């Protein structure tokens, strides 16, 4: 994804993200992320960890794009759904599909649709 972006808007977005919890979603599933961080503004790069024990771990390894959904402090129920071992998490939350067929959760603080830049296999 090579769309132009506003660095100041991206910086403001990261600055207002206080909960530290978000949900990564694909076309068919997702999981709770509590390690999401901005790595670079130019180029825009983000970083997060996926545990190998995560239900959707293998499917995320083969993705070209996905979404990060920023949760509000009152959305613990959504965080818990995506932290579970349930194999049909998306059916339990309101969402829509983007033009790239990526599920985006409704009523969150916001979302980013991202493409994979690099994957590093380190540990569990």
Q: Language-model features: where?
A:
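Active-site-proximal mixed secondary-structure blocks
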Residues: 1-124
């Amino acid at each position: 994804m090579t769309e132009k972006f506003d660095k100041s808007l991206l910086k403001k977005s990261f600055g207002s993200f206080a909960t530290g919890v978000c949900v990564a979603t694909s076309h068919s599933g997702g999981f709770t992320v509590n390690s999401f961080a901005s790595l670079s503004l130019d180029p825009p790069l983000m970083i997060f960890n996926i545990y190998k024990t995560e239900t959707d771990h293998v499917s995320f390894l083969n993705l070209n794009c996905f979404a990060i959904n920023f949760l509000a402090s009152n959305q613990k129920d959504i965080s818990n759904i995506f932290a579970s071992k349930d194999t049909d998490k998306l059916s339990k939350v309101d969402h829509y599909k983007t033009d790239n067929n990526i599920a985006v959760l409704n009523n969150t603080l916001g979302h980013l649709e991202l493409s994979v830049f690099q994957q590093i296999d380190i540990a569990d």
